[in-house]
Amino acid sequence: MIFLKRFIVWTFLFIVTLIQLLLYLPDFSCISKNGGLPICTSQFNFAIVDSSHITHDFITSIRELLRLLSYLTIDMGWSSGLPAPDAYNDENLVDTFHLNNIYKVNYFGYCKKNGKQKEYCTSNHSSGMDILALLVRDVGIQLGKLSSAYENNTEILGESLVFTYELSLSSLHTFIKGDRQRGNILPKIVTNQGNEQTDLEYSSSKAYDKGVSLAYGLMLFNEIMYFIHIFEITISVHCFLNVILFGFALVWGKKQILLPTLLKITSSLLLVFASISFSGNLLYLLLLKMLEPDPTGITTTGWEMLEVKAGSGFIITCIRVGIQWIFLPVAFITSNHYIQPKKQQTKIDELKSDDESTVKQV
């Protein structure tokens, strides 16, 4: 009867930890390099919209710049099988900022769709869910498709552009931070106004500084959340292994100190990092929602250019965190019930030492 009771307790712990561990598998979707329909349970989906005159002009300018880069790439190293005139068609050029594109973003990868046709999925690497780095990577991948040097491995150019973007952003942020301490010399040099600076020029330079700081903050935030999530998954694996070892201890029939203590520690750490990761994910999603256009048009800055929706992966994350909140008190109650009291352990140690001394005397 006692064995059956312990087996039921361990089975419950095993099933709960196994379920929460398996619910991490969708986080590794959206990274398939194969064609067809790769599975993608995204944390969120976003599309670019031109909701105002400002965003329309901004997006149009970027698209024209990417069109120019596409032409240069084709002229300097085009070697695909298409006829030369067809290579300059719009469908063969970089379309990162096309309004029909839908980006499905996950922790470790993203998928890009154009309407109902899914184009490709690739890994984010350490950039996490940073949408700016994602767009830069997409530009690099598409340029790689147009280049003879990278047409067989387009991810190389995408990763190179992301590395250049992050390095340039870090250097620019450091320079602007130092320039503030020197009295904003850069705007004065650029505008050639000496020590004088108009209100319009000052507001423009401040907006530029805020834009760089925002992009730099998003880059750091997503990198930190990326490594926190990896550590969270690692703790989840250790927690599952601890439950298995704890089950062997229950079957053996002896109360332990080490295994129940480890179970309490790993379950506590798991919930802490899972809560941090979930809170950061939710905060990031809410920040992106602020870049959506207001349907009423009451509150607007003119720069709302995203349409963001929570994905199926976010719902799975909510379920997983809920299971982990249930698992923590159960793990503590079970560990406290089957842990060996310190007094009893001390008494056992004393008896062992007495037996050893008796054996030596004999």
Swiss-Prot record:
Keywords: Membrane, Sporulation, Transmembrane, Transmembrane helix. Signal peptide: none annotated. The keyword Transmembrane helix applies. Residues 28-232, 289-312 are lumenal. The keyword Transmembrane applies. It is a multi-pass membrane protein. Involved in spore and ascus formation. Required for the efficient assembly of the precursors of the prospore membrane to a continuous prospore membrane. This is Spore membrane assembly protein 2.
